[in-house]
């Protein structure tokens, strides 16, 4: 695949201003966050939000995450109660998304919430995302900058490989330091419910607010990441491999690596789950581009309690 690099720009002050201007015009901009790159549009503009769904080929029933500068901006759009305040104090800015009750009225486009009475909100920690939010002055709807069902992008080049003229520019903040999606926690009801495992382990959330329920398998999507096909590689994936063939890409972890693969990619030779999580999407993309027939994943590992590698 030929990658169009002319839209990849360094996040200088001038380019941040240009990105904010493009967003004001209803265009889309790719922006780095600490988790993955986001496909950002004006969260208050229904047409811009619709353009995100179209560019990603995303089902309209799958809500988007709205990104904010600070807690005061979040509170203007959503009802921030005691549990949310505790989590915000501990984990924001950072890779935690909270699903809260929308305020009425709410400036965020209803399409971003997929017509629900809730809204998914986050304050990103990445300095480029923060700078763009500050320059733009409004919340950004910013799901991962990939076509729906494909691997999430952790570099600007990954975004350029996915999108053409749908994106006005790609702000290059380097490789995303976390490399996996934010954890999503639903606080819109009486019980806190984990909707999507992610960068912040469930144990840390439980320590902050008490017991957390698990989402039921048949629940309607209240936030991104609840579709079975989410973030899948193109190649067939063989799990818990104890060996690998010459036509396979081996995704390994730790010092003990089976031999025989056509290509071996080690998530973390040192066995560090944090390093492995940061490398996961990039290495799956490399595996997809290898020209080999399958991916073999060695013995299952976890990041925290719930994020499997």
Question: What would you call each of these model-derived segments?
Answer:
Residues 308-309:
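Extended, polar beta-sheet/loop recognition surfaces of beta-rich domains
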């Amino acid at each position: 695949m030929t990658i169009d690099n002319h839209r990849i720009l360094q996040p200088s002050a001038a380019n941040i201003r240009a990105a904010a201007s493009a967003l004001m015009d209803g265009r889309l901009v790719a922006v780095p966050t600490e988790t993955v790159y986001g496909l950002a549009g004006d969260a208050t503009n229904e047409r811009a939000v619709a353009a995100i769904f179209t560019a990603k080929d995303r089902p309209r029933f799958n809500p988007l995450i709205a990104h904010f500068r600070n807690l005061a901006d979040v509170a203007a759009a959503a009802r921030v109660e005691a549990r949310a305040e505790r989590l915000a104090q501990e984990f924001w800015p950072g890779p935690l998304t909270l699903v809260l009750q929308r305020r009425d009225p709410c400036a965020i486009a209803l399409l971003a919430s997929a017509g629900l009475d809730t809204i998914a909100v986050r304050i990103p920690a990445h300095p480029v995302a923060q700078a763009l939010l500050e320059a733009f002055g409004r919340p950004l709807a910013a799901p991962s900058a990939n076509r729906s069902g494909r691997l999430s992008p952790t570099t600007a080049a990954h975004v350029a490989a996915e999108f053409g003229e749908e994106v006005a520019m790609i702000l290059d903040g380097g490789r995303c330091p976390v490399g996996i999606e934010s954890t999503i926690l639903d606080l819109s009801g009486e019980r806190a419910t984990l909707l999507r495992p992610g960068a912040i382990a469930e144990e840390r959330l439980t320590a902050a607010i008490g017991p957390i329920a698990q989402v039921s398998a048949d629940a309607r999507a209240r936030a991104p990441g609840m579709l079975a096909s989410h973030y899948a590689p193109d190649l067939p994936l063989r799990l818990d491999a104890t060996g690998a063939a010459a036509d396979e890409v081996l995704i390994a972890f730790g010092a003990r690596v089976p031999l025989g693969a056509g290509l071996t990619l080690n998530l973390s030779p040192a066995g560090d789950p944090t390093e492995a999580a940061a490398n996961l999407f990039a290495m799956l993309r490399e595996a997809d581009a290898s020209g080999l027939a399958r991916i073999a994943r060695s013995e299952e590992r976890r990041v925290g309690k719930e994020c499997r590698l």
